A protein has these predicted regions:
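Sensor-1/coupling segment of RecA-like P-loop NTPase cores
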Residues: 227-245
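P-loop NTPase motor domains
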Residues: 1-232
Length: 245
C-alpha cells in the first residue's frame, strides 16, 4: 500500500476481506464456457483413474447447463456455480430440466445436445451425471457458494494501475480450494494474453505461482510460450520436480 499498490485478495476463509469471483460471469463464448466444464471435471478427478468416456459425458452436461444459465434473461443473478449445482441436483432422469433447457438454450444445437444426453441408456446417463455432480461437491460449502455468486474484481485493472492480488488459501487445505485457484488462474491468464486487453503501454504482470503442483491449468505449456510477448513474468514454486510431470 505504501508503494502505491491497490491490494486485493481472493480469500474463501474471510469473505469480508475477499473479492467476489464468479467464473461464469467471465465466460462469454462457448469455448470459455466449455473450458469451465473441463476444469470442474478435471480438478475433481486429478490423481484418479477414470474412464475418459465418463469425463467427456460429465463435461458435456456441465457445458450444456452453463450455456443455458448464461442465456437466462437474468443471467447476472442466476448464472453461477451454486445454481449449476442446483440444476444437477434437480436432474433426476433429465426430464425435470427439459422445460428449463427449452426456455434458455442459446441455440437449437444446445437444446438437441441436451435431448441427446438424456436419451442415453439410464446407466450411462446416471454415471455421467454423477461425475458432473461430484465435480461441484465443494459448492456444498456455503462460503464458496457465496464467494462465487458475484464478481467484484476487474482483471483489466491489473494492466491499468499498480495492483497486488493475493490468492489466500490455508496451507493444509490447498487441495480443497484448488478448484477456485484453477478457474481463477485460467481465466486470468486468458485475459492477460488477449490481444484486445493488451497495449504496448500496459503495465507488466508478475505471477508467483506457489503450490503449483496443486494446480490444473489447461494448456499451460502454450500459455508459457506466449507470456513474454505480453510482458508477463512467471515464477513457479514446486515441492518436488515430480510435480512437473
Amino acid at each position: 500500500v505504501r508503494r502505491g499498490f491497490k491490494v486485493y485478495q481472493l480469500n474463501p476463509t474471510d469473505l469480508t476481506a475477499s473479492i467476489a469471483y464468479n467464473p461464469l460471469d467471465a465466460a462469454s463464448t462457448f469455448p470459455e464456457m466449455q473450458e469451465i466444464a473441463h476444469i470442474l471435471v478435471r480438478t475433481a478427478t486429478k490423481g484418479t483413474k477414470v474412464d475418459p468416456f465418463w469425463l467427456q459425458g460429465a463435461e458435456e452436461i456441465l457445458g450444456i447447463l452453463i450455456k443455458c444459465l448464461k442465456s437466462h434473461p437474468d443471467a447476472t443473478k442466476y448464472a453461477n456455480l451454486a445454481n449449476l449445482q442446483y440444476l444437477l441436483q434437480a436432474f433426476g432422469d433429465g426430464t425435470p430440466l427439459t422445460p428449463f433447457v427449452a426456455a434458455t438454450a442459446p441455440d437449437d444445437a444446445t437444446y438437441h445436445a441436451y435431448k441427446g444426453f438424456i436419451s442415453q441408456a439410464d446407466k450411462t446417463k446416471q454415471k455421467e451425471h454423477s461425475q458432473a455432480k461430484d465435480s461441484l461437491a465443494v459448492l456444498a460449502d456455503p462460503d464458496i457458494a457465496r464467494l462465487t455468486s458475484a464478481n467484484s474484481f476487474d482483471f483489466a485493472s491489473l494492466r491499468r494501475e499498480k495492483t497486488a492480488l493475493f490468492l489466500v488459501f490455508p496451507q493444509n487445505r490447498v487441495s480443497y480450494y484448488s478448484l477456485l485457484a484453477n478457474l481463477f488462474y485460467t481465466q486470468l491468464f486468458h485475459h492477460c494474453l488477449d490481444d484486445r486487453a493488451y497495449r504496448p503501454d500496459s503495465l507488466p504482470i508478475y505471477f508467483l505461482l506457489d503450490e503449483f503442483g496443486h494446480l490444473t491449468i489447461p494448456d499451460f505449456p502454450a500459455i508459457i510460450t506466449t507470456t513474454r510477448q505480453r510482458r508477463i513474468s512467471l515464477s513457479i514454486v514446486l515441492q518436488s520436480t515430480s510435480q512437473l510431470v
